Amino acid sequence: MASSDRSSAPRPVPGSYGLPVIGAVRDRLDFYYFQGQDKYFDSRVERYGSTVVRINVPPGPFMARDPRVVALLDAKSFPVLFDVTKVKQLLFSLLQSRKDAVVPTFRSNFSALFSTVESQLAAKEGGNKVEFNKLNDATSFDFIGEAYFGVRPSTTDLGSDGPSKAAKWLLWQLHPLVTLGLPMIIEEPLLHTFHLPSFLVSGDYKALYSYFSTAASQSRVLDTAQSLGLSREEACHNLLFATTFNSYGGLKVLFPGLLAGVANAGQKLHSRLANEIRAAVAEAGGKVTLAAVEKMELVKSVVWESLRLDPPVKFQYGHAKTDMQIESHDGVLFQVNKGEMLFGYQPCATKDARVFGPTAREFVGDRFLGEKGKKLLKYVYWSNGRETENPSVDNKQCPGKNFVVLVGRLFLVELFLRYDTFTAEVGTELLGAKVVFTGVTKATSGPGTA
Ligand code: HEM
């Protein structure tokens, strides 16, 4: 965006999507039959007096994803399509600027979670069982809001409804991929054939948007976005997506998966973790510092092992950019043509026994320790890239990669500063593991007892 344009305040993109379904079907008929392609776009540019307009693009219902787009119909705006880096730059700058807030906000939010676990375990009516996932949803949502913007969503107008609104919106994004356990005859038409109507979730989206708009303004993130050439409105939608879908959606699955793996690994691993964590924290003067966390090699290995065995995002898609050959692990070459859609199911790739040996399907906490262990890291793919590589504005690797491995480690630190060991029942739910605490043994040594 040229600096001369910035002097005028950004305005909303004009246009209309019409009524759900009916609007898109009408537009499709215009596009294919009544107007033809060129006229379809030209007439809308004329109608709204703007070359950047909100319109539906065919095919729309019921075949394609959401038909609603912001269409860029002039030579100046169009090149934005070539450049996804502004949004990424914004996320890198956000994570970098909030680096120092992560440890204290993590600790305050998650120590409150564990206090709740303890009091609920002590209360007889709970039957000595405490569901971790529900507590994690509420805590992770608040933690992310506070870590990124300094404002806990539960203290705003959203109140305690943030996680449920976010989960509903997530379901609207992910329903083609999930099953709710209902009979197939109901689920197929409901979840897998059509997109759920967006007006049913628009109230939830608006409430979330309002939180992001206020919190990101207060924390000046939207000022940064503007200085990168993004409009405040566009930046806010992107922050909502990165925070709710990528970050909250990620932590909703990451922590139960990690806890499940560690619970099943048993007491021996628990005491090794507790010893390592407490020694490093004691050495740092009783404080959980980033430097202390860096020294915890076993902790890091356990987080990687969990991400290897149970990657939170299991499917990957990509178009072949050129005609290419793909080699399988059996040494077979396959021809793939430009434009073909490639699809990967990650759990298969990261449990390959030819890389991870006979224990490939097992949780081995210390797998990545030492020189030999480090050599395996390049086969850990959870971030849409190798664990030995780093995300940048030029690649499609998860920009939250380092943040995720850090919070995974902080989770174990909090757990084993507090407890010598714990027991839990492990099952599965919609998107990953379900964990129910059945008992915790308070720490008998180290800084956690202070
Ligand atoms: C456990 C947590 C997380 C997991 C498992 C995860 C995983 C992934 C994966 C697999 C992708 C690639 C998707 C694809 O193109 O196929 C991705 C992309 C992305 N992630 Fe994460 N992520 C997590 C947390 C985060 C966090 C905390 C952020 C916050 C900044 C984030 C931001 C993004 C963004 C913006 C992309 C799109 C990158 C691009 O297409 O260029 N993620 N993530």
Predicted regions and their residues:
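N-terminal membrane-proximal hinge/A-helix region immediately C-terminal to the signal-anchor transmembrane segment
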Residues: 1-89
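Hydrophobic, well-ordered secondary-structure elements that form the walls
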Residues: 306, 339, 363, 400, ...
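Conserved cytochrome P450 K-helix/beta-meander segment immediately N-terminal to the heme-binding cysteine loop
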Residues: 344-382, 387
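Cytochrome P450 catalytic-core helices
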Residues: 250-276, 399-419
